[in-house]
Amino acid sequence: MFTSTGSSGLYKAPLSKSLLLVPSALSLLLTLLLPHCQKFFVYDLHAVKHDLQIWRLICGRIICLDLKDAFCSGLLIYNFRIFERRYGSRKFASFLLGSWVLSALFDFILVEAVQYSLGVTVASNLPSGFLAPVFALFVPFHCSIPRVQVAQILGPLSITNKTLIYILGLQLFTSGSYIWIVAMSGLISGMCYDRKVLQVHQVLRIPGRMAEFFSWALEPIFSSSEPTSEARVGMGATVDIQRQQRMEQLDRQLMLSQFAQVRRQRQQQGGMINWNRLFPPLRQRRNINYQDGPRSEQRASPPLEVSEEQVARLMEMGFSRGDALEALRASNNDLNVATNFLLQH
């Protein structure tokens, strides 16, 4: 029930692999061999605020001191590797950096808000680790990954391809007393970065030169070999073609399931898809044919503006730009109708 998009393993996801291996190894090292050094990685807001120990904002927010949190966050990072493959390592790293920086600010705001509004004194030590960016990744996961029903239980309740990911997130959310503050700050920072609030995505991003340096220095260390199991899929003539076709097939299945769900919701509401937008009525077409040719050309309305974001989403599913533009114009910028139109033609 894990999200399955593209190749299995960590192929073409070096940043996800580094975030999965390095913090987990350091957490084990601090827990088993160096417990006396854990004090340097405690996320102490009181020490940051009153003693100006700014370094704790870095050390206290990288390594998990609780192995249970390290395990759950590692599983979530492994499943969220699909965003590194979709966006690229630089954009994925920029999202993590932006949400990591913003969440530090929201931690202080939430602690002060709880203290002054509810009169509840929050403990100075918040859960340590790279947790806020992990919760921030739930924002694009919820918005951009369609639901595919796997099984149905208890009538309206159903198990989807995203159920286990949400269960892992809930397990991490309930693992400590004050981890909900870190989770809320991560979700808020993820929404701010994903929605481009105050253009934070332009300010908090990885510079090109730095991305090139890390790509040259660290990518060979954390890069994974090409999976050989996919070569058995008899689709294309090469492994790259097979992988691309498999990714396109999975993405199309996801979007087709999403379209079926939207169609069922519209049928339950008593409404059907307005196919008149795709095929005009016969009377209207006759009136158009009776009009004068040059005059109708002068009165022709300009082409419909198409959202570039929706074009990009259709191109990510494997459709060409021309087909995506034509389908979106025919469906009046309805992404679900355009997707169904492209899947059936």
UniProtKB/Swiss-Prot annotation:
Signal peptide bounds: 1-39
Gene Ontology BP term (one): Wnt signaling pathway
UBA domain sequence ranges: 305-345
Stretches assigned to the Cytoplasmic side: 113-125, 185-345
Record text on subunit structure and interactions: Interacts with LMBR1L, FAF2, AMFR and VCP.
Known function: Restricts trafficking of FAF2 from the endoplasmic reticulum to lipid droplets. In association with LMBR1L and E3 ubiquitin-protein ligase AMFR, negatively regulates the canonical Wnt signaling pathway in the lymphocytes by promoting the ubiquitin-mediated degradation of CTNNB1 and Wnt receptors FZD6 and LRP6.
The protein, known as: Ubiquitin-associated domain-containing protein 2
